[in-house]
């Protein structure tokens, strides 16, 4: 039997109370709202489906359409690794316990997921065939194992001889489990005959380039390495007859309970995380993919060999590993790719200008429409400024070659105190963060690994500068990671401010994190886990009390917190206009009579990944606007450290409102959630097409930030000086006898 690392019962119980709501919770008033709630997992799959359908947009360049298919497949990988893995664990623990939000048992959810996956695979097959046929007609051909062209065959043979020494075949006796295959690793699997019993052959394909490109006449031929190995499968088993050979890819569970492992390990958190990563590599499989087709016999052998139920062995003509799509981008002609819109260089500030500018104005950076450079420049300005004493920052996901990490290291080398709260548990970025923790420590930064029970997901940076009158705080509150790569792909916001209340709260957050504690009370920041959901609910209740005069607009990535959704239902019933912009998971149905008639929900799927979080409550003088790092998932409201700041600057408020208004106007990339739980694409009809992301790029490019003007010198007087009048002379002193006489006479 393979040594799959199965979580214990206590770990399963912890997993069972995650983002989908406490499965062990008793019945409550939430049962009354079941008809307006959607299942979290099926909502995730609905989001993936919207991403896939971008590949059907004929107005997009061909490679862009193919890339959307690859994004869909990558999302599905993560879904199975994270969500299906957790559901499998729960199904083992209490298979009949229903989810508190959707009312479905783990088994029912797994079955529904399997059906949805099969339907999406069929759509992906058709789209992939259409797109690759169109690319072939335009001069880019993706070769397959069953090619017949003699020139292509000769090229394949030549390339196979190059990689053949790097591949090793294995024979698996009948009835034995399959050898260990790494997560998302491909292998050729074959049914072999010629021995006593039918056996399986396996050729793992790992650590090889994803593809090879050939330029033949005017055609670019892309040969995926997996297709190449599949073509020559018989040559790995010369003493056997290969009855059937296909590509196999295994997806493994990535859900591992870290809380118990992290408890009491403050002395060496990094070593524990490295042990966790090694352990995760051997978790049980949750999905198998066979390409391009497979007999029932082979499907059964794979299911038995991997200890998988048959319904989680998927057969499809869509490539099981579309990683070659990303890798081959450099081979694709420009006319097949989208035009890259460069971020606007509209912030005229340079290093040395930021402190003086921020002393007078708040600054908003809207990514990717504007560059992230101003924030990097601010860090370098702080590093070189003699009055700066410290820089504190939370780090969750850093770029591969991070200029921000370099700036922090430079500041430490310049003698500044640099404190980095680095979250090692950022899923799938753990090793990257471990590497950066060593680099930052080597540069002289103080690295803190956050809290045992809560992930530190907040995006906060605090610069402390000593002035004659006291400490001045320069605070950055953001919605996205300090990551230059995603800053070009995700829509995010950075607010830079010298608001003293925000600075004091940020200092309180960092003091608490340094002491291994959460933040119970703040002046103005909303800080999860204690002060985020409660503040959101308070603001919703304020608008509920206003009735038809109330207004709520919320933009987040995902939402499934039942308490927040219950408050939104109450607001809708009170007549409050509720507009939600939820890109991904959304577990609330709008437009349900008696519940959510006044709730409207949109999702934008475009060139950039919508990622900023914006909360607006009220209109006019009652309006309050907040931005921050957290979604409205239970994991954000209960088990993470998040931070939101109120935006008081009128100009920046207007910019944030413009973002929401643009999303409301979008009639090309918007989807509307209906009362039955389905999504419908918004189309222009007779109106002019309006794409919010393109419009926002133009809008923020026009928001010029000029350098602060130097103080004007005191003007010299140019008018002629006025003559100064002499004071009147003192009165003349009288002789003594005259003064005596005046005294006698009473004068």
Task: Annotate each language-model stretch with its function.
Residues 577-581:
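Hydrophobic alpha/beta core scaffold segments
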Residues 2-552, 570, 574, 586-747:
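N-terminal localization/anchoring segments of enzymes in phospholipid and broader phosphate metabolism
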């Amino acid at each position: 039997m393979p040594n799959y690392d199965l979580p214990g019962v206590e770990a399963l119980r912890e997993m069972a109370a995650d983002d989908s709501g406490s499965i062990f919770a008793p019945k409550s008033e939430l049962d009354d709202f079941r008809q307006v709630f959607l299942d979290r997992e099926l909502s995730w799959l609905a989001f993936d489906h919207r991403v896939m359908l971008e590949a059907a947009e004929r107005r997009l360049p061909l490679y862009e359409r193919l890339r959307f298919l690859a994004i869909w497949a990558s999302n599905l990988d993560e879904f199975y690794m994270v969500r299906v893995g957790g559901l499998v664990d729960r199904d083992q623990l209490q298979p009949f316990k229903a989810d508190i939000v959707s009312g479905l048992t783990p088994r029912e959810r797994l079955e529904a997921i399997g059906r949805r996956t099969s339907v999406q695979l069929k759509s992906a097959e058709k789209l992939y065939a259409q797109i690759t046929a169109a690319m072939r007609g335009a001069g880019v051909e993706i070769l397959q194992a069953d090619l017949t062209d003699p020139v292509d065959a000769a090229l394949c043979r030549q390339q196979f001889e190059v990689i053949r020494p790097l591949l090793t075949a294995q024979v698996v006796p009948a009835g034995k489990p399959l050898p260990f295959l790494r997560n998302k690793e491909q292998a050729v699997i074959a049914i072999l005959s010629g021995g006593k019993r039918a056996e399986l052959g396996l050729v793992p394909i790992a650590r090889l380039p994803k593809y090879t490109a050939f330029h033949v006449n005017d055609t670019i031929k892309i040969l995926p390495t997996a297709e190449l190995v599949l073509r020559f499968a018989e040559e790995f088993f010369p003493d056997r007859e290969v009855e059937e050979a296909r590509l196999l890819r295994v997806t493994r569970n990535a859900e591992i309970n870290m809380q118990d492992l992290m408890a009491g390990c403050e002395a060496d958190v990094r070593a524990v995380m490295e042990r966790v990563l090694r352990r995760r590599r051997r978790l049980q499989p949750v999905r198998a993919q066979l390409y391009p087709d497979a007999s029932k016999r082979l499907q059964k052998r794979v299911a038995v060999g991997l200890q998988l139920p048959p319904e989680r062995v998927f057969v499809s003509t869509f490539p099981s590993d579309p990683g070659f799509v990303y890798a081959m981008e450099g081979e694709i002609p420009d006319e097949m790719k989208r035009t890259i819109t460069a971020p606007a260089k509209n912030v005229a500030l340079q290093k040395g200008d930021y402190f003086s500018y921020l002393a007078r104005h708040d600054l908003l950076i809207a990514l990717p429409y504007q560059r992230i450079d101003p924030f990097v420049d601010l860090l370098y300005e702080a590093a070189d400024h003699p009055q700066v004493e410290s820089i504190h920052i939370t780090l969750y996901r850093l770029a591969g070659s991070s200029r921000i990490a370099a700036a922090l290291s430079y500041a430490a080398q310049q003698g500044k105190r640099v404190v980095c709260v680095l979250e090692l548990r950022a899923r799938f970025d753990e090793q990257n963060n471990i590497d950066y923790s060593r680099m930052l420590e080597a540069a002289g930064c103080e690295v803190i690994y956050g809290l045992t029970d809560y992930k530190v997901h907040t995006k906060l940076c605090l610069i402390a500068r000593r002035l004659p009158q006291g400490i001045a705080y320069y605070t950055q509150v953001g919605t996205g990671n300090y990551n230059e790569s995603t800053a070009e792909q995700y829509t995010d916001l950075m607010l830079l401010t010298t608001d003293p209340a925000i600075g004091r709260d940020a200092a309180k957050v960092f003091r608490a994190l340094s002491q291994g504690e959460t933040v119970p009370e703040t002046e103005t920041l909303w800080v999860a886990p204690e002060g985020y959901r409660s503040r959101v609910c308070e603001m919703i209740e304020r608008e509920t009390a206003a009735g038809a005069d109330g207004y709520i607009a919320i933009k987040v990535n995902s939402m499934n917190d039942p308490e927040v959704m219950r408050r939104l239902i109450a607001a809708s019933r009170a007549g409050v206009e509720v507009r939600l912009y939820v890109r991904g998971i959304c577990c609330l149905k709008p437009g349900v009579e008696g519940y959510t008639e006044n709730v409207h929900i949109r999702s934008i799927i475009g060139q950039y990944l919508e990622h900023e979080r914006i909360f607006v409550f009220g209109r006019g003088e009652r309006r309050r606007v907040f931005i921050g790092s957290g979604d409205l998932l239970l994991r954000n409201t209960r088990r993470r450290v998040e931070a939101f700041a109120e935006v008081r600057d009128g100009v920046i408020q207007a910019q944030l409102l413009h973002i929401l208004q643009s999303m409301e106007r979008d009639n090309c990339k918007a989807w509307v959630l209906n009362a039955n739980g389905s999504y419908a694409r918004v189309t222009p009809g007779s109106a002019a097409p309006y794409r919010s992301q393109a419009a926002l790029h133009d809008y923020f490019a026009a928001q010029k930030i000029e350098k602060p003007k130097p103080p004007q010198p005191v003007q010299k007087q140019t008018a002629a000086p006025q003559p100064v009048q002499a004071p009147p002379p003192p009165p003349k002193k009288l002789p003594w006898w005259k003064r005596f006489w005046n005294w006698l006479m009473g004068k």
